[in-house]
Curated annotation (Swiss-Prot):
Subunit structure: Homodimer.
Protein's recorded name: Serine hydroxymethyltransferase
Lineage: Archaea, Methanobacteriati, Thermoplasmatota, Thermoplasmata, Thermoplasmatales
Function description: Catalyzes the reversible interconversion of serine and glycine with a modified folate serving as the one-carbon carrier. Also exhibits a pteridine-independent aldolase activity toward beta-hydroxyamino acids, producing glycine and aldehydes, via a retro-aldol mechanism.
Organism expressing this protein natively: Thermoplasma acidophilum (strain ATCC 25905 / DSM 1728 / JCM 9062 / NBRC 15155 / AMRC-C165)
Any single Gene Ontology cellular-component annotation: cytoplasm
Length: 426
């Protein structure tokens, strides 16, 4: 049965590709890679190992790997305007692990966004911070503006004196108030760590905010959301040499050995493409997000942060508690071929994670395959018909498939490729 089992897995992978190729992906944490990035992902690099830094390896056979990593660092330095870059983390959470091991130890206090306020699970007491045995305290959150309250948070920092102030959210609609809180950071002498996983591509495109120039010592991130590369991680710095050395030691030998060389190379290619196409891509993402949010709001959905224009990023949050709840809405839309996720909102208890009040929507992948303002309006109409008018999911799914058929080619990159085709080798 072994071959049949292998064929079964292959068939399921092909069906998975077909599902996304025929559907509209609005998950805020996903994207599709460019042809060149995907090409190096299946190169011989995927089979090889490298430990340590370029030209100081523990393995032979790394001559070309070193050249690739050198160039990747150069591209990241140019893109983010810093000499401190590390492309080795194998995911955003892996990068976060290295950061917390470098910046804080057991018993230290770290200020973080709350989970229901959009914070990432790695920054929760049951995530990496808890595993490091640090103490956490959450910033006061302004539900009207859907961001940290800078005045109250500054007072908290001065009173509690955390060793590290962590910013960054998985529902990241507006810039973190780094500049507004700079005086508090300086008064207590804390390190400022910015988790830019969701908005890294917007930052690369010169949009949203510039954390390294606004006071962040360290920026961590994954490289497959608004930054449209492989599932990998990166760390950027604007800090003292001692702290940067601690970060690099935490990466290796701290939280990884080999750093997935194919993904590192794909990251470098994506950085090169971002230097050429990133500004336009970031502009189009934000423009599309605003249009979709406005249309959903006009159609009767409770899209949050209406007074602030709904969003300044790729993401919007929608309170669907009166539409059946996050679980029902996400599952219903999946039946229609529209893929997004349920999400906690600031007033939700963490215990409601399986059926929260909200949904989270991201437009970076739809934008990546060429969708624009008119398609955003059409998507809003399809969502409205499914959730508010309760139309037949199969009917809507057929219309989704028809719409998506014209938007499969990856844009904002070198070359042309169907982003959803399954690559058969045998």
């Amino acid at each position: 049965m072994s071959y049949e089992d292998a064929e079964y897995i292959r068939e399921m992978a092909m069906k998975h590709s077909e599902m996304f190729g025929e559907g509209i992906a609005l998950i805020a944490s996903e994207n599709v890679m460019s042809p060149l990035a995907k090409e190096v992902m299946i190169s011989d690099l995927e089979s090889r190992y490298a430990e340590g830094l370029p030209h100081h390896r523990y393995y032979q056979g790394n001559y070309y790997v070193d050249l690739i990593e050198d160039r990747t660092n150069e591209l990241l330095s140019k893109l983010f305007r810093t000499s401190q870059t590390d492309p080795r983390p194998i995911s955003g959470t892996n990068a976060n692990s290295a950061a917390i091991y470098a910046l804080a130890g057991p018993g230290d206090l770290v200020a973080t966004p709350s989970l229901s306020g959009g914070g990432h699970i790695s920054a929760a007491e049951f995530g990496i911070l808890g595993m490091r045995s640090v103490r956490t305290i959450n910033y006061p959150y302004d539900m009207d503006t859907m961001t940290i309250d800078p005045d109250q948070a500054s007072k908290m920092i001065i009173k509690e004196k955390p060793k590290v102030c962590l910013f960054g959210q998985s529902v990241f609609m507006f810039p973190a108030p780094l500049k507004e809180m700079a005086e508090a950071f300086h008064e207590v002498g804390c390190k400022v760590w910015y988790d830019g996983a969701h908005v890294l591509g917007l930052i690369a495109g010169g949009r949203f905010q510039d954390p390294l120039r606004e006071g962040a010592d360290i920026v961590t991130g994954s490289t497959h959301k608004t930054f449209p590369g492989p599932q990998h991680g990166v760390i950027l710095g604007n800090t003292d040499d001692e702290t940067w050395k601690a970060v690099r030691r935490a990466v290796f030998p701290g939280v990884l050995s080999n750093h997935h060389l194919n993904a590192m190379a794909a990251l470098g290619i994506t950085a090169a493409e971002e230097l050429e196409f990133g500004k336009r891509y970031a502009d189009d993402i934000i423009s599309n997000a605003k249009v979709l949010a406005e249309e959903l709001y006009a159609n009767g959905f409770n899209v949050l942060a209406e007074k602030r224009g709904f969003t300044e990023s790729h993401t919007m949050a929608v309170d669907v508690s009166k539409n059946g709840g996050g679980k029902y809405v996400a599952e219903t839309l999946e039946k229609c071929g529209i893929i997004l996720n349920k999400n906690l909102l600031p007033w939700d208890d963490n215990k409601k994670s399986q059926n929260p009040s909200g949904i989270r929507i991201g437009v970076q992948e739809a934008t990546r395959v060429g969708m624009g303002k008119s398609e955003m309006k059409e998507i809003a109409s399809l969502i409205t018909r499914a959730i508010i008018r309760h139309e037949d999911p199969e009917k809507i799914k057929a219309e989704v498939k028809q719409l998506k058929s014209g938007f499969r080619e990856v844009k904002y990159c070198y070359g042309k490729m169907d982003g959803y085709s399954y690559i058969k080798l045998i």
